[in-house]
Amino acid sequence: MSNESNNTSQDQVEEAVTPEIVVDEASLMDELTQANFRIEELEQLLAESETALAERKDVEMRAAAETQNIRTRAAKDVEQARKFALEKFANELLPVIDNMERALQGTNPEDEATKAIYEGVELTMKGFLTSVEKFGVTQVNPQGQAFNPEHHQAIGMQPSAEYPANTVMMVMQKGYLLNDRLLRPAMVMVSQGGGSVDVEA
């Protein structure tokens, strides 16, 4: 009987343990499935975070590049503004220079009565031109040079045996540049070249 009672108690122990094992396996499978879902969720969140981080880095790099471009443009604009700040002032000085040139042209340097005036105007004009050159204003006097539409304004064309075609034969009014930028074009008469053209038969 003791053997039977041992068998009975062993059967009872096995019956009691077996449901626990089955319950444990089911709960483990359940936990494993939940863990797998959680891993997938975390991997998806990680991928989204990495994508967002890459996008933010890209936006940050673009913003830094744009900031650098703005700084470069601003520095260039400041340099241009400083370089050409005198443009209006220089334009106002050009008629004064023109008037001094006309005074020189209208005065005879050989005549004793006007010689002193001529020399005074000439010295004043040289000093004036030297002063404006220090600020980047230079004369455009294209006498005898090829016609350049960027710096010259043609008033007309005339035939000339002395000057080849498209050459400035007369400067009516000198032009001026401010730091290599045109302030006023030179008013010029352009040569058409010789009056006759040889034609071969």
UniProtKB/Swiss-Prot annotation:
One of its GO terms (cellular component) is cytosol. PROSITE patterns: GRPE. It comes from Shewanella frigidimarina (strain NCIMB 400). It is found in: Cytoplasm. It comes from the Bacteria. This is Protein GrpE. One of its GO terms (molecular function) is protein homodimerization activity. Its main location: cytoplasm. Participates actively in the response to hyperosmotic and heat shock by preventing the aggregation of stress-denatured proteins, in association with DnaK and GrpE. It is the nucleotide exchange factor for DnaK and may function as a thermosensor. Unfolded proteins bind initially to DnaJ; upon interaction with the DnaJ-bound protein, DnaK hydrolyzes its bound ATP, resulting in the formation of a stable complex. GrpE releases ADP from DnaK; ATP binding to DnaK triggers the release of the substrate protein, thus completing the reaction cycle. InterPro entries: GrpE (IPR000740), GrpE_coiled_coil (IPR013805), GrpE_head (IPR009012). Keywords: Chaperone, Cytoplasm, Stress response.
